[in-house]
Amino acid sequence: MALSEPILPSFATFASPCERGLQERWPRNEPEAGSTDEDLNSVLDFILSMGLDGLGAENPPEPPPQPPPPAFYYPEPGAPPPYGTPAAGLGTELLRPDLDAPQGPALHGRFLLAPPGRLVKAEPPEVDGGGYGCAAGLARGPRGLKLEGALGATGACMRGPAGRPPPPSDTPPLSPDGPPRLPAPGPRNPFPPPFGPGPSFGGPGPALHYGPPAPGAFGLFDDAAAALGLAPPATRGLLTPPSSPLELLEAKPKRGRRSWPRKRAATHTCSYTNCGKTYTKSSHLKAHLRTHTGEKPYHCNWDGCGWKFARSDELTRHYRKHTGHRPFQCHLCDRAFSRSDHLALHMKRHM
């Protein structure tokens, strides 16, 4: 009866047919116990040696990270790279927090510095503040960059007192005596209205509107004109002040010696025949007539001298011979002469 019953296989043979198929397809080699311990020890020694080299006591402490610079940041497109992979070893995962060096402030948080060409910020048109004393280069700044520290100072300078925008530029007085024009009281717009079209040099641009000058702008010229006896003009041009008082004084004719002598007409003529000489002075003609008549009214009164002369200057030169007076002296040497023509001849020798 026992032989007639069918013999069934054991339960363990078909408990896991999939596992049996996998084992038959990929046979697994069991490693030896001794070699596994040696490999594990070598891996641990390598990891410990690498960790001690990276975290040695001889390395100086790293400086604290500096704060990030003031600039625009934008997130990098794309998914961030994974910090770890499933294939990383056990030792690498354990030592990752100790071996990772702190990243720089510019790349912390997976942010990159944006180039200046990508950022475009629409701003209202700027007008140079004439009376606020701010340089145009500081007020505008480079395009595409955000300067927080510099814009704080320049913004306060451009806003003016009490945080208001600068008023429209007025024409300064043409004279230091005139009081400066103050802006009209009242609320100001945060931005100046756009200027209307106006004449420009070479191309379109904002037209500059000038207000009327101050009442005392021409006070200096009015006082000078009143002192000179000139009536002040009724109307004046906006940018054409009256002439300077110095120019008015120079325009008057000067009273004094002429720059060139006026040539006199020779009206005195000798009446002797075959002579016809003319002179500008009557005394010169009288002396000339004495040459024709032979008259010598000037006599030398020196004792023992009876010389006579027709001209007084000839008597004067003759009298110097008796006295020895020599008024004409050479400035290059010690010689002196009684006559000027003798000194002129002597000066030619020094030349």
Curated annotation (Swiss-Prot):
A Pfam family per the record: zf-C2H2
Zinc-finger is among the record's keywords: yes
Compartments it resides in: Nucleus
InterPro entries in the cross-refs: Znf_C2H2_sf, Znf_C2H2_type
Motif position, 9aaTAD: 42-50
Domain of life per record: Eukaryota
The keyword Zinc appears for this protein: yes
In-chain residues carrying the UniProt-annotated modification Phosphoserine: 243
ZnF C2H2-type span: 268-292, 298-322, 328-350
Renumbered residue ranges of the record's region Interaction with WWP1: 110-264
GO molecular function terms listed in the Swiss-Prot or TrEMBL record: DNA binding; DNA-binding transcription factor activity; DNA-binding transcription factor activity, RNA polymerase II-specific; RNA polymerase II cis-regulatory region sequence-specific DNA binding; sequence-specific double-stranded DNA binding; zinc ion binding
Entry comment on modification after translation: Ubiquitinated. Polyubiquitination involves WWP1 and leads to proteasomal degradation of this protein.
Subunit structure: Interacts with WWP1.
Family: Belongs to the krueppel C2H2-type zinc-finger protein family.
Protein name stated in the entry: Krueppel-like factor 2
